[in-house]
UniProtKB/Swiss-Prot annotation:
InterPro entries: Cyt_b/b6_C (IPR005798), Cyt_b/b6_C_sf (IPR036150), Cyt_b/b6_N (IPR005797), Cytb/b6-like_sf (IPR027387), Cytochrome_b (IPR030689), Cytochrome_b_C_euk/bac (IPR048260), Cytochrome_b_N_euk/bac (IPR048259), Di-haem_cyt_TM (IPR016174). Component of the ubiquinol-cytochrome c reductase complex (complex III or cytochrome b-c1 complex) that is part of the mitochondrial respiratory chain. The b-c1 complex mediates electron transfer from ubiquinol to cytochrome c. Contributes to the generation of a proton gradient across the mitochondrial membrane that is then used for ATP synthesis. The cytochrome bc1 complex contains 11 subunits: 3 respiratory subunits (MT-CYB, CYC1 and UQCRFS1), 2 core proteins (UQCRC1 and UQCRC2) and 6 low-molecular weight proteins (UQCRH/QCR6, UQCRB/QCR7, UQCRQ/QCR8, UQCR10/QCR9, UQCR11/QCR10 and a cleavage product of UQCRFS1). This cytochrome bc1 complex then forms a dimer. Heme 1 (or BL or b562) is low-potential and absorbs at about 562 nm, and heme 2 (or BH or b566) is high-potential and absorbs at about 566 nm. Belongs to the cytochrome b family. The chain crosses the membrane at residues 33-53, 77-98, 113-133, 178-198, 226-246, 288-308, 320-340, 347-367. This is Cytochrome b. Binds 2 heme b groups non-covalently. It comes from Spermophilus variegatus (Rock squirrel). The gene is MT-CYB. Its main location: mitochondrion.
Amino acid sequence: MTNIRKTHPLMKIINHSFIDLPTPSNISTWWNFGSLLGLCLTIQILTGLFLAMHYTPDTVTAFSSVTHICRDVNYGWLIRYIHANSASMFFICLFLHVGRGLYYGSYIYFETWNIGIILLFVVMATAFMGYVLPWGQMSFWGATVITNLLSAIPYIGTTLVEWIWGGFSVDKATLTRFFAFHFILPFIITALVMIHLLFLHETGSNNPSGLVSDSDKIPFHPYYTIKDILGALLLILVLMILVLFSPDLLGDPDNYTPANPLSTPPHIKPEWYFLFAYAILRSIPNKLGGVLALVSSILILLIFPLLHLSKQRSMMFRPLSQLMFWVLVADLLTLTWIGGQPVEYPFITIGQLASILYFTIILLILPAVSLIENKLLKW
């Protein structure tokens, strides 16, 4: 008798996706982050669901309801901090996952890559709206500043901002709709993840060498299921150390002050995972220019397949490209640091130089270095 997992319509899909999936035998730990992102999404949906049971999306009671969750709800403090810090873990995994894709040339599977970038955008939007919900000072002012950027769009900008706000300022209507969107988007993300996997399984996984690995495939289970479980345990370990020992390490102390439209915090800044883009935004002294640079800093990922001029897919055997890749990583870390600093000398200059370097490496240096490597290898 044939195994049920190979005949049952539903089990067959699961079997082809997670059990009998032919997988390259040499994929490294850098390929673990896909499953870790799935774990983060699951944690976020579950903890978010329980938080939504006690949260009230109203300007008068939002802050108090979060306090109530932390003080009165059974293990509410734990659920809240797991939710807040899992968001950080989510973005750490996202950045490493995208970085892996850039390093090993995974963007050559452009359908999978493009869906991945759409996912990145939607996750960023979800995280931004979630940050507004506790209705602390940084929630309110972050929402005001970031949504106000849309007013830079010519002609329709101001109308668009007021339409998003549901009034003439960030208020009850804004909070209510942000809560609604924050609730629905993770399910849209889940659907996009399924499409992401669908396209990935059309081609099969890339591998560190960037070479075709059809001649050397192994089943996903048990080899990579065990490997993914190890990764998941390590992620949960790091997350729980963060949650139980320093839950506010990555948050902003200003968010423990209830939102006050009459008092502006000295330094308005988003969560740490948006700081690199925020630094690029601030480095341009023109509003529309800044917004375009901000959007371009993420959208530029879409043109990586077009900028790939090397004859080799992966950077594994390309030392010059490797060097430039790590310079790009260092540049992004510099931008993240600058994004959290006040707007004054020397931070303004460092931010501008780092922003220029970011776009120069991607648009000019990496393609040029690829051509040099082709020449050196006489290809």
